[in-house]
UniProtKB/Swiss-Prot annotation:
The chain crosses the membrane at residues 11-31, 50-70, 77-97, 101-121, 133-153, 160-180, 206-226, 244-264, 268-288, 298-318, 332-352, 360-380. Its main location: membrane. The gene is tsgA. Pfam families: MFS_1 (PF07690). Belongs to the major facilitator superfamily. TsgA family. This is Protein TsgA homolog. GO terms for molecular function: transmembrane transporter activity.
Amino acid sequence: MTNINRIGLTWISFLSYAFTGALVVVTGMIMGNISNYFHLSISQMSNIFTFLNAGILVSIFINSWLIEIISLKKQLIFSFILTIIAVIGIVLCNSIFLFSINMFILGLVSGITMSIGTFIITHLYSGSKRGSLLLLTDSFFSMSGMIFPIVTAYLLEKKIIWYWSYICIGAIYLLIFLLTINSSFEKFKTNTKNSKETKEKWNFNVFLLSISALLYILGQLGFISWVPQYATEIMNIDIKKTGSLVSGFWMSYMLGMWFFSFIIKFFNLYRMFIFLTSMSTILMYCFIKSENFLNQQYIIISLGFFSSAIYTIIITLASLQTKHPSPKLINLILLFGTIGTFLTFIITSPIVEAKGLYVTLISSNILYGIVFFLSILIYFNKKYEGVI
């Protein structure tokens, strides 16, 4: 494989996460504008966006088998066509039903592309380089989560209608398409053929890592989704200031991924997993207990930094449980992580309604604590099973 081709494939992986990040973050940001457009309440609109998460969930689930039937290149080209259809559908649709279908299609595209992006990195690189590149890939999710809200805010400020945000997001997939048609995917044909021939044995750590992925994502999104309301209603902080908490979290999250992508090669991944989950659990607890807004800003920035590498370390550790990680193994972790995303509002909304915002944040903190204990269990189980 030529170096230019390897770079092109790596950038497809980077942009696959950027596409998903932009979709998820922007969709939440313009919820109020869309609800006004369709004359619905925000609570009704939040249920509609379940279609986006459902699309991601379904596509990651089926992609484990799809990857053995349809080549990666064809999947990416077909996904580009679906993106065009969905974006045009969003622009032209005048009913919430059609909007929901288009969001589901974008979810399907997002899940397939992110799954392919992760698969590419795990098969192009090995060892510590794999971990570093996975962290760098994941950082593009946060990067687009920072850039696109700025773009969206600019568009809304200029009184440009909300669906132009989705047209801008579609431009990311145009770049993926251009890279796809100019790249060779021959290496992956032999990899998927080998994974069919070799029956992969998964150890107990794969199950523990899958549960860790679910609980971590559920805990993270359950926390960060309700922080603005918590700061406004419980801390009595101005709504404009609460935005700095979320943006500070994602900015430090992105910087943390860049930092850990360089230093991860010098540390044992299992011990790093234990350290980061313990620090994140403590920092989240400190944030919830703090009554000073300035302290909360420092704490949430630290939380974003220390929690940034956890999900990628989970994926990397899962890929190291077997000699040749198959698409099914990687997709299993992504599937459980996506289930965590899907369950976020299904689980947290009733808690907010019944027990309030404080208990909801404590629930997220408990989930982080469980992931910390699972990281210790995974470490000792690794030693018992003799995994490298």
